[in-house]
């Protein structure tokens, strides 16, 4: 995939109407935004365009309204909070059909530096199907397109891809630029040793990532629920642990591929187990890889955590996607905590691949110790798989 995309500095935006696709898919509780990270992430691009005298038309989806207006998924709270953050009124164009009379009037009345926010793009059923009619309507409002929503870059929707068929100038904003820089470098030209850590529940979610990374990394660390499928592939007993029987053979192939490639594949050598999946279950540490009948693995053990931490500390580039255990249960969070600590203490380039690992790092207060926390869970996974992301591919090359 070509990561060398034109960014906003390369476009003359003064006096031009710029349609910016942001990711304002934020959690709401009774109309109040409970996590503002995505709004904060969008500010550098919006502020730059304001300073340069562009007319800024923001668009985003929120949740899954499935092609019809749902009041609880309106972007009104986002418009209000952005107005406070920017110290400037963000005009909210509240049209159920997104590009309606309110939007057209608001855009027509804009002065340089003004900001308009359109209603939730997924109020339109055409959005997720990337249908021409809605792409054209969105594009008709603007002269230039800027994509700054990495979280939806793996989706070919009207507001991420379709509009670029009608707006010939299409660039990335600062957020996507940063994602391309760190994830792109990690995948294409990492400083070595390069260590990747994969966790989470299922091997099936990470099949292509494992396969792609084995061609690139020096060390691959496996933890989380997916670790038990690998342990079974090595012939160990895993009790009642989560296992994907249909992926045991695949796991064996990956163990062989790692040997062939000279990749140091690290798998758990001890586990923290319990007799039930419950936050109050009593944790028991196994002596070795084997898990007894009636028990299930819920975290990597202390010996494993030490080996994993040492590997991280000797790395120059580290990419992490997926927790090491059931992080939500205090008794089974230690593996994830130890990995996060090792990354926080490291001088390496440390990249967190969005999703649960990003949440874990932020909860632990290590967020500011990481080089880069990706804003896209699904998008960063597809990036690590080596897939082309449609929302990036559609932008102008440098």
Swiss-Prot record:
Entry EC number(s): 2.7.2.3
Any one GO MF annotation of this record: ATP binding
Descriptive protein name: Phosphoglycerate kinase
Catalysed reactions listed for this entry: (2R)-3-phosphoglycerate + ATP = (2R)-3-phospho-glyceroyl phosphate + ADP
Binding of ATP, residues: 206, 297, 328, 354-357
Species classification: Bacteria, Bacillati, Bacillota, Clostridia, Eubacteriales
Pathway of action: Carbohydrate degradation; glycolysis; pyruvate from D-glyceraldehyde 3-phosphate: step 2/5
A UniProt-annotated Pfam family: PGK
PROSITE patterns hit by this protein: PGLYCERATE_KINASE
CDD domains noted in UniProt: Phosphoglycerate_kinase
Binding site for substrate: 23-25, 38, 61-64, 122, 155
């Amino acid at each position: 995939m070509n990561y060398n995309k034109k960014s906003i500095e390369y476009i003359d935006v003064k006096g031009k109407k710029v349609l910016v696709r942001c990711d304002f898919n934020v959690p709401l509780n009774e109309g109040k935004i409970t996590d503002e990270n995505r709004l904060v992430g969008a500010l550098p691009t919006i502020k730059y365009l304001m300073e340069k005298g562009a007319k800024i038309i923001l668009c985003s989806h929120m949740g899954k309204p499935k092609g019809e207006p749902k009041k609880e998924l309106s972007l009104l709270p986002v418009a209000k909070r952005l107005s406070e953050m920017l110290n400037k009124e963000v005009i909210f164009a509240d049209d159920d059909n997104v590009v309606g009379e309110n939007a057209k009037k608001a855009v027509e009345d804009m002065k340089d530096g003004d900001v308009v926010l359109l209603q939730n793009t997924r109020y339109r059923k055409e959005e997720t199907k990337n249908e021409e009619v809605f792409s054209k309507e969105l594009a008709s409002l603007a002269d230039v397109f800027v994509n700054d929503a990495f979280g939806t870059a793996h989706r070919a929707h009207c507001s991420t891809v379709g509009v670029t068929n009608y707006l010939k100038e299409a660039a990335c904003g600062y957020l996507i630029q940063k994602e391309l820089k760190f994830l792109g470098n990690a995948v294409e030209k990492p400083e070595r040793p390069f260590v990747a850590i994969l966790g989470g529940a299922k091997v099936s979610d990470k099949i292509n990532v494992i396969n792609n990374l084995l061609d690139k990394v020096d060390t691959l660390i496996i933890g989380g629920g997916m670790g038990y499928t690998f342990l079974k592939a090595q012939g160990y007993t895993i009790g009642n642990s989560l296992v994907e029987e249909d992926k045991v053979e695949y796991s064996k192939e990956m163990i062989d591929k790692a040997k062939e490639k000279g990749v140091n594949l690290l798998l758990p050598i001890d586990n923290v187990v319990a007799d039930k999946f419950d936050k109050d279950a009593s944790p028991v540490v196994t002596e070795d890889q084997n898990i007894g009948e009636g028990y299930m693995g819920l975290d990597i053990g202390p010996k494993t955590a030490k080996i994993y931490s040492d590997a991280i500390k000797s790395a120059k580039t580290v990419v992490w996607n997926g927790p090491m255990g059931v992080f939500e249960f205090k008794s089974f969070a230690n593996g994830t905590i130890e990995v996060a600590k090792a990354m926080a203490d490291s001088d390496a380039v440390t990249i967190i691949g969005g999703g649960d690992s990003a949440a874990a790092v932020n909860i632990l207060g290590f967020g500011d110790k990481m080089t880069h926390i990706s804003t896209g869970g699904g998008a960063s996974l597809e990036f690590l798989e080596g897939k082309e992301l449609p929302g990036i591919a559609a932008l102008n090359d440098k």
